[in-house]
Amino acid sequence: MTTPFKMERGVKYRDAAKTSIIPVKNIDPNQELLKKPEWMKIKLPANSAKINSIKNGMRRHGLHSVCEEASCPNLHECFNHGTATFMILGAICTRRCPFCDVAHGKPLPPDPDEPKKLAETIQDMKLRYVVITSVDRDDLPDRGAGHFAECVKEIRKLNPGIKIEILVPDFRGRIEQALEKLKDNPPDVFNHNLENVPRLYREIRPGADYNWSLKLLKEFKTIFPHIPTKSGIMVGLGETNEEILQVMQDLRDNGVTMLTLGQYLQPSRHHLPVARYVPPEEFDDFRDKAEKMGFEHAACGPFVRSSYHADLQASGGLVK
């Protein structure tokens, strides 16, 4: 008889320990993988002083970056430019999406001092634009929305004039309560990723719902019509270009004006494999179509991620 898997609180479960308990699809770690094309190969910068400086600054304050926790391919570039996306509410997610490298498990209670520590770190780094994201916290009554609001409040208190983008989870089952918590301390940009097409949601985002995510974006825009909303899509997971275009149209129909679209990369052999590497010219075509749909800002390219050059995109610069 097999002993049921029991998670310990505060322990990070990654790779096979994480994806083996997803009931939707078993991933064969020995399967043959697609070879990376030349356009997907990154040359890492030689100078790591800035990278170490940012990492050390976060360690001193007990903070996390999604750049490290999700193994982002742009980490070296962004850290060398002195930018990072902070991840609040711990580094353990209550979901176990098989595309994501963030650890799964039973998270510890939120750190009540984190908003102040975050604000002080941002002040030390002299940032003028900051992105705040989080793991999913389905264990919390408000799904972590109150903690987001407190972070925004403390950041603005110590950093007047700063621009704040929040990249939020779907606040499953608590949209109204979550948006109520954000009313007094809204961000400058509200970001929530759809990730991929609805046909593949059960496989890619177990525990999430496509229409629920659209509802979150729409309801935020209804309450805060002057604040831009943003969403991100990954390609290369088995979707068709026509399906991606429909997702883009769904976003526009729900008031979203900022888009990021990038290539999915497999974090390990225990994650979903890449079904296709989308060539750069197709990303250019997606950008052209996004602009025709009415997106004010569309960052489309192989290495584009949700917060990649977020400050540049928010100011209207071309990101690809």
UniProtKB/Swiss-Prot annotation:
<dbReference type="GO" id="GO:0046872">
    <property type="term" value="F:metal ion binding"/>
</dbReference>
<feature type="binding site">
    <location>
        <position position="93"/>
    </location>
    <ligand>
        <name>[4Fe-4S] cluster 2</name>
    </ligand>
</feature>
<dbReference type="InterPro" id="IPR013785">
    <property type="entry name" value="Aldolase_TIM"/>
</dbReference>
<keyword id="KW-0949">S-adenosyl-L-methionine</keyword>
<keyword id="KW-0479">Metal-binding</keyword>
<feature type="binding site">
    <location>
        <position position="67"/>
    </location>
    <ligand>
        <name>[4Fe-4S] cluster 1</name>
    </ligand>
</feature>
<dbReference type="InterPro" id="IPR007197">
    <property type="entry name" value="rSAM"/>
</dbReference>
<dbReference type="InterPro" id="IPR006638">
    <property type="entry name" value="Elp3/MiaA/NifB-like_rSAM"/>
</dbReference>
<dbReference type="GO" id="GO:0051539">
    <property type="term" value="F:4 iron, 4 sulfur cluster binding"/>
</dbReference>
<dbReference type="InterPro" id="IPR031691">
    <property type="entry name" value="LIAS_N"/>
</dbReference>
<comment type="pathway">
    <text>Protein modification; protein lipoylation via endogenous pathway; protein N(6)-(lipoyl)lysine from octanoyl-[acyl-carrier-protein]: step 2/2.</text>
</comment>
<comment type="similarity">
    <text>Belongs to the radical SAM superfamily. Lipoyl synthase family.</text>
</comment>
<feature type="binding site">
    <location>
        <position position="100"/>
    </location>
    <ligand>
        <name>[4Fe-4S] cluster 2</name>
    </ligand>
</feature>
<feature type="binding site">
    <location>
        <position position="307"/>
    </location>
    <ligand>
        <name>[4Fe-4S] cluster 1</name>
    </ligand>
</feature>
<protein>
    <recommendedName>
        <fullName>Lipoyl synthase</fullName>
        <ecNumber>2.8.1.8</ecNumber>
    </recommendedName>
</protein>
<feature type="binding site">
    <location>
        <position position="97"/>
    </location>
    <ligand>
        <name>[4Fe-4S] cluster 2</name>
    </ligand>
</feature>
<dbReference type="Pfam" id="PF16881">
    <property type="entry name" value="LIAS_N"/>
</dbReference>
<feature type="domain" description="Radical SAM core">
    <location>
        <begin position="79"/>
        <end position="296"/>
    </location>
</feature>
<feature type="binding site">
    <location>
        <position position="72"/>
    </location>
    <ligand>
        <name>[4Fe-4S] cluster 1</name>
    </ligand>
</feature>
<keyword id="KW-0963">Cytoplasm</keyword>
<keyword id="KW-0411">Iron-sulfur</keyword>
<keyword id="KW-0808">Transferase</keyword>
<dbReference type="GO" id="GO:0016992">
    <property type="term" value="F:lipoate synthase activity"/>
</dbReference>
<dbReference type="GO" id="GO:0005737">
    <property type="term" value="C:cytoplasm"/>
</dbReference>
<keyword id="KW-0004">4Fe-4S</keyword>
<keyword id="KW-0408">Iron</keyword>
<feature type="binding site">
    <location>
        <position position="78"/>
    </location>
    <ligand>
        <name>[4Fe-4S] cluster 1</name>
    </ligand>
</feature>
<dbReference type="InterPro" id="IPR003698">
    <property type="entry name" value="Lipoyl_synth"/>
</dbReference>
<dbReference type="Pfam" id="PF04055">
    <property type="entry name" value="Radical_SAM"/>
</dbReference>
